[in-house]
Amino acid sequence: MIEAWGGILNLVLYPISMLGLGYYTVLTVFSPNTLVSRYDLGEKSVPIIRIVGSFVLPTLIIGVWIIFRENGPLGCWIFFVFNFLVSLCQVILSWGTRLKIIDPDSKTDVGDEVVGHVFVAIAAILIFRLSDTIYA
């Protein structure tokens, strides 16, 4: 299994990113009211949060499936690039919000911004370190 993942570092970073994705899956699918109260979104935002969760949950399912595949991440470049692009978009939007370019009245959370940067870094490291495997 370690050989399929190109080393122990990749095998540590990948589950960390999946745990983070799992956390957001739980929040968006099973506990949207936590996000409603954290960001003062209002009760009418619950359906749209669950719609976001309907995109996050399949991503998590595919990510867990990749862990247990016989060939590991072999040929799964689109999954890794997708995760990188989603995280990058989150970071760009959070910077835009923090700089009052996008939605200047919204409530921001520094913790979410840090997590976004961590996810971008993990995704970039995994793409770089697994490039000969995921693009095979």
Q: Model-found features: residue ranges?
A:
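Hydrophobic transmembrane helix segments
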Residues: 2, 16-48
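Physicochemical signature of membrane-embedded alpha-helices that form the seven-helix bundle of GPCRs
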Residues: 9-16, 48-55, 78-85, 112
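Core segments of alpha-helical transmembrane spans in multipass integral membrane proteins
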Residues: 19, 23-25, 46-68, 85-91
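Small-residue-rich segments of transmembrane alpha-helices in multi-pass membrane proteins
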Residues: 47-50, 106-123
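Hydrophobic alpha-helical membrane segments
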Residues: 56, 79-97, 117-124
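Juxtamembrane helix-break-helix junctions at the cytosolic face
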Residues: 63-81
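Membrane-helix boundary connector in multi-pass membrane proteins
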Residues: 92-112
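Juxtamembrane boundary at the C-terminal end of a transmembrane helix
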Residues: 125-136
